[in-house]
Design a protein with these regions (language model features):
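Predominantly extracellular beta-rich ligand-binding scaffolds that present long acidic/polar faces
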Residues: 1-175
Length: 175
């Protein structure tokens, strides 16, 4: 997926919501979300899940998705307010299984339980995945226990050359 733009506000009571792609096992590049997204589950400005999908089936697709095995998001921007109940990120709700996020930015407010300016939750394999050269300037509010300017919860992943200038407010103590 390259050069896609979402300008629509979306609110639903379903499980997950994103501006560009549901689950990404491919590449999303130079895409932008400008719409406010709100949902009772996981929410990501660009995708819900980003992962390396070697041999896995694509389970569900939002508006635009590409099936391959890369799991890469690059040069994407979120400008819309993002709110959800669980994993919530300005770019992606969950970054798993060697997924890469590079050169992306979030400028909007993000709120949820496990909440980050770029990713709500990130885990993967060392040296093969991570979040690189990303910026967050939006304010982060974690109603649960994990919140961060870049990632809400990081397990076995890498974050490098990233910058947060937004405020981070966490209601519980795991920040």
């Amino acid at each position: 997926v390259t050069g896609c733009v979402n300008n629509s506000n979306m609110t639903s009571a379903g499980n997950s919501k994103s501006g560009i792609a549901g689950e990404n096992y491919g590449t999303v590049r130079k895409s932008e979300n400008n719409g406010d997204l709100s949902n009772s589950g996981n929410v990501g400005g660009i995708t819900i899940e980003n992962r390396n999908g070697k041999g896995q089936a694509l389970l569900f697709i939002d508006d635009y998705a590409d099936l391959s095995v890369n799991g890469e998001i690059s040069e994407c921007v979120n400008n819309g307010a993002i709110s959800g109940k669980y994993d919530v990120g300005g770019i992606v709700a969950e970054n798993y299984s060697c997924g890469k996020i590079e050169n992306c930015a979030n400028t909007a407010e993000v709120s949820g339980s496990m909440t980050g300016g770029i990713a709500g939750r990130a885990s993967g394999c060392y040296k093969k995945s991570g979040i690189k050269n990303c910026q967050n300037s939006g304010n982060i509010t974690a109603q649960g226990s994990y919140g961060g300017g870049i990632v809400g919860e990081l397990i076995n992943g890498l974050v490098y050359f990233c910058e947060n200038t937004g405020d981070v407010n966490v209601e519980n103590c795991n920040s």
